[in-house]
Design a protein with these regions (language model features):
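Membrane-embedded alpha-helical segments of multi-pass transporters/permeases
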Residues: 165, 212-213
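Short linear motifs at protein or domain termini
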Residues: 1-105, 214-220
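Short, flexible turn/loop "capping" segments at secondary-structure junctions
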Residues: 36, 68-69, 135, 178-180
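Conserved amphipathic alpha-helical segments that form helical-bundle/coiled-coil interaction surfaces
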Residues: 98, 105-168, 180-189, 197-207
Length: 220
């Protein structure tokens, strides 16, 4: 749900929930980046809602640790420090390895085809941000293919923290090519129903992503 559109299409959801989901998606997609300021009146105007559901959504974002009060009015999107980043990737390695293992056992033919289509989109992407979008969809497809609602829920929570990382690792030299190769090998392991290999490849993929992330952080 784009952050600059109204919430008319969010039928069946309380307005506060729809507003929260719109803001969370804006964070995940990089519309709002670490350090950006969110103001009630601006968000309300963009989403065409009153300030009451925005205030409710802001409270949930604060409770989840995604934003912090800024000086003056509004909230600031948090930026993770290096310790938090290392902890986040350690958890990603465990959970995404488990998701890949389960996907190798449960993924359907159409789901494997969807992974291949997403990887083709990643390969053809012309910008780092576009690669990041396909990458997120790729990983979410694996989460869904795991057939484990609790694991999927935990991984979705991590997606919120990933939104606080800032610049995509696909801006690091040679990382897009390496990530494409890692994704391709992971797809083949899932397609072959090789759970051990899929787990190991997913974990290695996250470790390589962490190395690229730390390079970005060292550059400042």
């Amino acid at each position: 749900m784009a952050v600059d559109k109204g919430l008319d299409e969010a039928e069946g959801l309380p307005l506060g929930e729809a507003t929260f989901r719109a803001l969370r998606e804006a964070l995940r997609s990089g519309i709002y980046k670490p350090g950006d300021r969110l103001r009630e009146e601006e968000v309300a105007e963009r989403l065409k809602v009153s300030r009451t559901p925005v205030r409710e959504a802001f409270g949930r974002l604060v409770s989840k640790g995604l934003v912090v009060p800024g000086q003056g009015r509004g909230l600031i999107v948090r930026r993770l420090d290096q310790t938090e980043v290392v902890e986040l990737y350690a958890m990603r390695e465990i959970l995404e390895g488990a998701a890949a293992r389960l996907a190798a056992k449960h993924a359907s033919g159409p789901e494997v085809d969807a992974l291949r289509d997403l990887e083709e989109g990643f390969e053809k992407a012309t910008s780092a941000d576009e690669m990041a979008r396909f990458n997120r969809l790729f990983h979410e497809c694996i989460f869904a293919s795991s057939r484990n609602r609790y694991l999927d829920s935990a991984l979705q929570e991590l997606q919120d923290a990933i939104a606080l990382l800032g610049r995509t690792t696909f801006t690091v030299e040679a990382r897009p090519v390496a990530a494409f190769r890692e994704h391709r090998d992971l797809i083949e392991a899932i397609a072959a129903q090789d759970a051990d290999k899929a787990d190991a490849l997913a974990r290695a993929h996250i470790r390589e992503s962490l190395r690229a992330r730390l390079r970005i952080m060292q550059q400042g």
